[in-house]
């Protein structure tokens, strides 16, 4: 029976196998036939259709019924086929945002699954649920590398699931499942779902050898290093730590997981072994300069193969230079660096890590490489010049550098023929670390520079004072115990310009026989060592006989004026009391005479007079002298500085490169020599820094005898002059009371009023006037007037007339409510008269005047800002005068004071009197806003617009909207927002850019322009003056600012209200001439960049373009044509020329006194890269510190977001200050641009051990705790989420969050980043995050090693990127210029400037094309 049963089963099995084989055979045959047929049909094509992604059903995904089937934060999503899939946040890839739906402006999305996932699986895409991104389950095993924290398993884990029913567990061990005795081991039980609310802490345990239950030592619900629970990490693992593993720990380990709310019970088992290791002994390392030999012995018989890994310890991380496995003794390691520390890691080769130890050694030293040249520059401290030399350690120091030697040697550039020794300037007194070596070996012990005295491997020394007319070459050596390096001859030099002689001898006076003149003899002309002398001026100071020379100012400080003004001023009694005396230029010569006579009006024969005025303003006036006075004076020597210093060839053995030096600015000079063109001296004096003047002391005073007392002049002085003075005093007192009571006189005596007005006009015309200034002289004129705290500007401004014309309409009490200020009245002759309403005689008044621009090219209406009572009148004026453009140069409120009533609506249609105003559009920019309105007059809109009833019903928008479209007008309002009352803008760039935009509008050129500030006189008058003077400059190549402002004041009183505004007119025009319009449209930027990159000899510009409006030259082309010619023969590109324009500056550099204080010196990494006092970040006071307000950081005004440019911390103390700044400024975004390998541990302000660690800065009383919450590594940057708590600030909530973006694509030895694209991506990410912080006004902190170089590039590109997004315009030059004015050492290299252009051009090319 049993046999039959076996036979029956065997038969069934054979039949089944036969059937299966047959089916496989026929199926294979059919497939082969089909394949052959397809091959014939597709002979020319070999394309294979890819596998179709599998659906959820094909993958066997369980269908969920509700969210109860899903893990914590999971959601059950049903597809079109009704199949439900659990989705959860944990299954999302790293690129998916954690949160979503917060930004109402740009709703954030959850992106897509990665490409690999979508190519294999056709499952629902990520979506937003409860403000969290949820994703479909994973299906591929997850590989965890040995370096991936916190697990470091070097193994695979289960794919993440979202359905509770998919619960599974896997057992793993670290570092291995087979280890040596004594090793610390961690066993893991890792599940594939989120355990929150599903798996309890005690529901997972380990069972050893099937009998011993061992509880986990750590679980996902426990905090890690004080942070939040780890349940939200990517993997959920229970851990069993086994310290000092023994053989008794060997065996099988089963992980068992039981779900608390269901009957799910899953397990996984692994085998774990503890064994005894083999060892090696007597391992030795024998190093030389370039290699090392490693030998060892093995225990227990045959040679044992080991693994060796050699790490060079030149930084905190180290670099692996040798790594091989399964090596036997001996081993030779070659190509090592001399005098370099190394660490040899020795380990077993059987994978069980039976042993692991290290061996440290250092290779032998040899002579170092030369030091690396960093930079050389000339610095101007205000009192003297110094040469700053910067260098870095050699590329291969080959040992410990014990000394550096620096030689700064200055040779004459232009010799006067005498044998002058080279100058060896000493190190500046404030820096005791440095010394200038003269090359004498006997002094090398004393003149070496010890590198220990410097904080890092960047060295900087200053040498001075420098002598004029010198070329200082720089050479640096490095020395270690093996010897001294070859010299590093720097390619850059410190070149000093010409200067005045060190001493000018005092002239000797001689009295002439006629007692009405006197002579001067000159013992010896000054030497030309400091530069060729171009002119000699003889200055004379007349004084009353009883005035002593002791009260005179120094000869170089006395005010110079005309002959008549000097005598008038110096003879006043008040001049002696106030010690205020003037001097005048009597004679001038190209060559110094041996003797000359003053007062005879005759110049020394055969000697030419100077063709250049003193200070470009004062000519010689050798007029007859007055007798009875005392005369003194001095000799002035003028030396013209060279504007350019041409390059010299180094390779031919000539002088080393000479680099251009601008004394007014600490920048790297450019190598130049004096041009050989026969340029006259006076043309060379228009260089912005001006010529140098040397002054002698006052010569001994000489007294001219008085005339007879019976002479007519004596009678005049004794009798008539006192009477005239009394008459002038009485007239002044009378006019004072007349002015005080002017309103009474104008009411009761109209005739007297007219006479008074006429007299005032005629009297003001008698004041001193100032002529037109050529365009080329505008910068020089500004510099000259700006000296001595704007003395000449103040004198010119005080000469402006104050017209007192009739203001009857403004003075009426019925119109008092329509005036914002009592002293700002509208002249009757030029006031705007509105149409009267219902016969009301006072309804035609508004405080506004017609203003004619230069030669009446435009018509302005200068108005006060509307008050609440005049908003309707304001719009009525716009309608009646047919104005289509309003220019507003004030803010609604300034310093908590209303400057202007808000006269426009933002959203709803609004009625102002008889004018309907409908908002059409608006846009906001950094310095201005543009609004458009459609307005209509009620009387011209037809009877159906306004319904019967009161005005309140008019607000019914549906009734009004669309009724007056045919009768409406489009009005533009350009609102400049960066100008405070009674002041001038800090920088002219924003206003000029705003004005360029206006000058391109037809509404600005062809219709009346309504312009207002608050009073309608100060900022309004300044704006009109600049615009009109631009027209005059373009038409006549000159500007008569004084005359035009006088004409303005004839049309409206007090136009240009302050000296500061008057000075700004000059400054704006001067900078317009110096820099031109560098603002480009985005669409033209690439072509503009290509033109700049071309050599000037290959490009030319045509200026034949005509304006389509009035036939004149268009403003854009005219502005370009006003600058110097764009076609030169020097071979430089336009970009290089534009970069050199950055060196031009009308003002002196700002001070950095606070950074130079003794207590702050150690807080600066580089002495030249410190914040200006005006823009430095001021820290709040700290208890226990006398002065703790300083940090090397500067405020930078941004476009939408402000910035702080800071240097990297230099110590733990400055790292604490860095966090104090972050807390005080409420910073949430930090950008780090320096290479982390350059940082020492004491400089880092974040935990260096990565995610989950913390660090502490400060003292017990004042401290900050910083925690690294997470760390994400990307291709070119690292994102760290940091959390900090300030101990001394109880008002600040704990655990404030800061995101740090650490850019890794910028090598420390590179001037610019490796990739413009990677930096642009980082900028976009930073700005996108900053814009997502709703309502945050906190600045973005950007820091690098010196706080200027890399930070300047990042901020510059950020500003340019934001502006091209908002305005579609780019201005690299002015953006860089603005940054340089906020912090020193920004954009000192041409490569940095060129990189900004290239980065924007590449971005625009990819974005707009």
UniProtKB/Swiss-Prot annotation:
Transmembrane segments: 713-733
Xref: Pfam families: fn3 (PF00041), Y_phosphatase (PF00102)
Residues spanning the signal sequence: 1-22
Tyrosine-protein phosphatase domain sequence ranges: 793-1072, 1135-1403
Impact upon substituting residue 1015 to V: In n1641; fluid accumulation in the pseudocoelom, reduced size and loss of both motility and fertility
Gene Ontology process terms (BP): chemosensory behavior; negative regulation of fibroblast growth factor receptor signaling pathway; netrin-activated signaling pathway; neuron projection development; positive regulation of synapse assembly; sensory perception of chemical stimulus; signal transduction; synaptic signaling
Domain Ig-like C2-type per the UniProt entry, residue ranges: 159-267
GO cellular component: plasma membrane; postsynapse
Entry's Gene Ontology molecular function annotations: protein tyrosine phosphatase activity; transmembrane receptor protein tyrosine phosphatase activity
Localization of this protein: Cell membrane; Synapse
Impact after mutating residue 1013 to S: Loss of activity. Reduced synapse formation between the PHB and AVA neurons and defects in the behavioral avoidance response towards sodium dodecyl sulfate
Keywords for this protein: Cell membrane, Disulfide bond, Hydrolase, Immunoglobulin domain, Membrane, Neurogenesis, Protein phosphatase, Signal, Synapse, Transmembrane, Transmembrane helix
Xref: PANTHER family: RECEPTOR-TYPE TYROSINE-PROTEIN PHOSPHATASE (PTHR19134), TYROSINE-PROTEIN PHOSPHATASE 69D (PTHR19134:SF495)
Described purpose of this protein according to its UniProt entry: Possesses an intrinsic protein tyrosine phosphatase (PTPase) activity. Regulates egl-15 activity which is required for hypodermis-mediated fluid homeostasis and protein degradation in muscle. During the formation of neuromuscular junctions at the larval stage, negatively regulates membrane protrusion from body wall muscles. Plays a role in nicotinic acetylcholine receptor (nAChR)-mediated sensitivity to nicotine. Regulates synaptic levels of nAchR subunit lev-1 in the nerve cord. Promotes the outgrowth of the quaternary dendritic branches of the PVD sensory neurons.
Protein name per Swiss-Prot or TrEMBL: Receptor-type tyrosine-protein phosphatase
Organism of this sequence: Caenorhabditis elegans
